[in-house]
């Protein structure tokens, strides 16, 4: 009898170990829902693939703060097209990084580019002739900001792939773009919330994919990962500046005055995609030229979505009134664009 119980115990432990191993394997959402290859380009071999830093294939599961940080810091040593700056630390001590990506020449001249942008922003100290010369000779600055809500996970994961694609691709289109543009990527604006939600994914992950959007693996549990350590919504803090993440971020953005800032979010699982232009009310302090260019970008985005046959909508609940969103930048002359996509978490 004792021998039988011992055998049953050993067998149970063995089966539990197998189940634990399966639980750690990535879910198969990406391969089932997205048939196109995510990273598809002509890449140099001297820069490590994102899989090097992950316990799974890129895109199969949510990457945590440590994995993303390790990747971009390593890439900064491997590529002359990338410069990484730490601009803040979260309440829990996690560093927040921003990645400057451009041609090697532009990266070497970042300080000069920033100084020229500062001159361009102040007509009191810059003549028309000097302003025209600056406009013709400096690259544009495009700021990409992701996952300010920690449980809206795809933004930070997308940022990881975008950084790799831009610094390692030999494609002519990418090379030409980086000669004319400095792409600034803030991959993870809320590391504390993201890691809190990533931990809940580990806790609720099953042995098989779960497509029920009411499941805890997709919704998480309180206090969720949307907010930072003190449960503050960082996408309400852009002009109040009460949180260290926001203070460092806004200071850096104000120094660079990008022409455009894209804010990547997720929304309900039953949704599709949403982008600009926003609905009314529009804050009367936003310059008309920004509204005009927002509509131009919106039309271009709509055409791109139509080519892919992706369903999307504009406006609806997205307004441009409150200055505490990322659209704070529009009160300083930058065009703000919101991207929203439906979420499944993992």
Regions found by a protein language model. Give the residues of each.
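N-terminal secretory signal peptides that target proteins for export/translocation
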Residues: 1-2
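Bacterial N-terminal signal peptides
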Residues: 8-17
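M14 metallocarboxypeptidase catalytic domain recognition
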Residues: 5-7, 20-346
């Amino acid at each position: 009898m004792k021998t039988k119980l011992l055998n049953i115990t050993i067998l149970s432990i063995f089966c539990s170990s197998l189940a634990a191993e399966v639980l750690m394997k990535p879910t198969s959402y990406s391969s089932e829902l997205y048939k196109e290859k995510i990273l598809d380009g002509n890449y140099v071999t001297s820069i490590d693939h994102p899989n090097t830093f992950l316990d799974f294939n890129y895109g199969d599961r949510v990457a945590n703060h440590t994995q993303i940080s390790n990747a971009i810091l390593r890439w900064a040593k491997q590529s002359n097209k990338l410069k990484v700056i730490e601009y803040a630390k979260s309440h829990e001590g996690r560093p927040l990084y921003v990645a400057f990506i451009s041609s090697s020449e532009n990266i070497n001249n970042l300080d000069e580019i920033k100084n020229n942008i500062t001159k361009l922003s102040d007509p009191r100290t810059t003549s028309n002739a000097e302003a025209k010369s600056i406009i013709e000779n400096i690259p544009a600055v495009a700021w990409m900001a992701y996952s300010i809500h920690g449980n809206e996970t795809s933004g930070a994961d997308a940022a990881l792939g975008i950084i790799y694609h831009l610094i390692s691709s030999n494609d002519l289109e990418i090379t030409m773009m980086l000669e004319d543009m400095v792409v600034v990527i803030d991959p993870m604006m809320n590391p504390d919330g993201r890691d809190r939600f990533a931990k809940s994914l580990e806790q609720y992950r099953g042995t098989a994919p779960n497509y029920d959007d009411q499941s805890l693996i997709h919704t998480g549990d309180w206090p969720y990962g949307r907010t930072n350590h003190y449960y503050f919504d960082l996408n309400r803090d852009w002009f109040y500046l009460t949180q260290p993440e926001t203070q460092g971020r806004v200071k850096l953005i104000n120094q660079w005055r990008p022409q455009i800032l894209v804010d990547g979010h997720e929304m309900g699982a039953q949704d599709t995609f949403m982008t600009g232009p926003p609905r009314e009310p529009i804050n009367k302090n936003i310059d008309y030229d920004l509204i005009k260019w927002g509509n131009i970008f919106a039309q271009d985005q709509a055409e791109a979505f139509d080519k892919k046959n992706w369903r999307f909508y504009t406006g609806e609940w997205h307004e441009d009134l409150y200055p505490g969103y990322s659209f704070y930048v529009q009160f300083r002359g930058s065009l703000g664009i919101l991207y929203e996509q439906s979420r499944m978490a993992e």
